[in-house]
Amino acid sequence: MAAVSGLVRRPLREVSRLLKRRFHWTAPAALQVTVRDAINQGMDEELERDEKVFLLGEEVAQYDGAYKVSRGLWKKYGDKRIIDTPISEMGFAGIAVGAAMAGLRPICEFMTFNFSMQAIDQVINSAAKTYYMSGGLQPVPIVFRGPNGASAGVAAQHSQCFAAWYGHCPGLKVVSPWNSEDAKGLIKSAIRDNNPVVVLENELMYGVPFEFPPEAQSKDFLIPIGKAKIERQGTHITVVSHSRPVGHCLEAAAVLSKEGVECEVINMRTIRPMDMETIEASVMKTNHLVTVEGGWPQFGVGAEICARIMEGPAFNFLDAPAVRVTGADVPMPYAKILEDNSIPQVKDIIFAIKKTLNI
């Protein structure tokens, strides 16, 4: 009460100054956006921007998508642009490819890329090869997107990574986002591209929130296809990855930093065309290389990176052989303990890095 009465006796201006001193402004909290919402936002902006863009796939319309990635789009754009299809990947992928040849820009969603094998003829023979076979006269501006790679408890037929499969095929562009910024920027670039683009998302990342920088909130935000990003600077070893394992690599780098090992972590973002310039420049700086992926080891993304390093100028800068961290060379088991041991974990990445550095 004494403090209050003291304030009452003071002139009003002085009281105002005293009260102001008790408060201070803090920077606003960074906007957090999930990967799911980032993809949704990117598709929404492109649907609004270009009336030739439309989305089709199983349960993408009234149900808002099996993973709710297309939430709200059917209510906003209606039946003509958000189209539910029968359970026939070969059928609706063929419709989408034909629409692209006719001048539209379809987004073809596979409920999982494991099911894209049902439509492989449409993706490879019709979409990927037509521009070449027509002598550049017939572009096929189509996006094939959906979850790729390991999920949780969905076993052998729903857990495969197709990065190497589609990255193998000329005529396709293949992107593999990790965080929300990647997801929005790459889906928008894919939709605007005049070539067929495969967008390999990850089911386990859909609900993960990431800081969303102001530039990513713009409707003009794009991430160029074919350009990697250095997520963490380092001097001792280069660690290259894509999709969900990028997060594991950053966790491993944080652990090793406490031991005096500084890892340079590269988020590939694009599988094809691969940004070898960024990878080579990093290897020339660190003199060591580890690749990390969730797919099988033989003929994988890591194998391609290692081969190109061996064939290129960075090879002479290596102080030790490059090491790959991959999924196990088996179909994905159902039991959780076996599943966990079939995909790269943080401990596996740390082990590989220490092996490469001989520590």
From Swiss-Prot:
GO biological process: glucose metabolic process; pyruvate decarboxylation to acetyl-CoA; tricarboxylic acid cycle
Transmembrane segments: none
Reactions catalysed, as given in the entry: N(6)-[(R)-lipoyl]-L-lysyl-[protein] + pyruvate + H(+) = N(6)-[(R)-S(8)-acetyldihydrolipoyl]-L-lysyl-[protein] + CO2
EC number in record: 1.2.4.1
One of the Pfam families matching this protein, by short name: Transketolase_C
UniProt subcellular location: Mitochondrion matrix
Protein residues bound to thiamine diphosphate: 89
Signal peptide: none
PANTHER family: DEHYDROGENASE RELATED (PTHR11624), PYRUVATE DEHYDROGENASE E1 COMPONENT SUBUNIT BETA, MITOCHONDRIAL (PTHR11624:SF96)
UniProt GO molecular function: metal ion binding; pyruvate dehydrogenase (acetyl-transferring) activity; pyruvate dehydrogenase (NAD+) activity
The name this protein goes by in its record: Pyruvate dehydrogenase E1 component subunit beta, mitochondrial
Cofactor(s) this protein cannot do without: thiamine diphosphate
